[in-house]
Amino acid sequence: MELNSLKPAAGASKNRKRIGRGTGSGHGKTATKGHKGQKARSGGSIKAGFEGGQMPMHRRLPKRGFTPLAKKIYSVVNLSQLDVFETGSCVDIEAMQKSGLVKNVCDGIKILATGELTKALTVKAHKFSATARNKITSVGGTVEEI
């Protein structure tokens, strides 16, 4: 075996299509472009989104809504997740990060009322939903907004 006699496996490589090289090639004359029409001409590509004169989709759909620049994004923690902490402990941002409840605090932490809380805790966060606040106080815990 020599390097100059190596050949690729059968079916591994394809011959490229040589277009416009005479009728005997099978791809001569119109060079696979068909007869006349916009796409047969040189530079005859159609713009992306063009729908043949019909009003294009991006202009048919309404321009609605906006994203507020000053929107605050809160990391969410549910009450059922707070049950990990011991009774009477103070649950603040650092405690939540250490236990893995919150990875990154963007604009703050919001406590939501999903699930049940069985222990009296002192919870410190930026925001609380009304039902979460009620559930924490009903168990005997305290709520502190930072």
Swiss-Prot record:
UniProt biased composition (Basic residues): 30-39
Region (Disordered) location: 1-61
A Pfam family matched in the record: Ribosomal_L27A
Top-level taxon: Bacteria
Name of the featured protein: Large ribosomal subunit protein uL15
Keyword vocabulary terms for this entry: Ribonucleoprotein, Ribosomal protein, RNA-binding, rRNA-binding
Keyword Ribosomal protein tagged: yes
Subunit text: Part of the 50S ribosomal subunit.
Family, similarity comment: Belongs to the universal ribosomal protein uL15 family.
Protein function: Binds to the 23S rRNA.
Record carries keyword Signal: no
PANTHER family: 50S RIBOSOMAL PROTEIN L15, LARGE RIBOSOMAL SUBUNIT PROTEIN UL15M
GO molecular function, one term: rRNA binding
GO terms under biological process: translation
InterPro entries recorded: Ribosomal_uL15 (IPR030878), Ribosomal_uL15/eL18 (IPR021131), Ribosomal_uL15/eL18_sf (IPR036227), Ribosomal_uL15_bac-type (IPR005749), Ribosomal_uL15_CS (IPR001196)
GO cellular component terms, semicolon-separated: cytosolic large ribosomal subunit
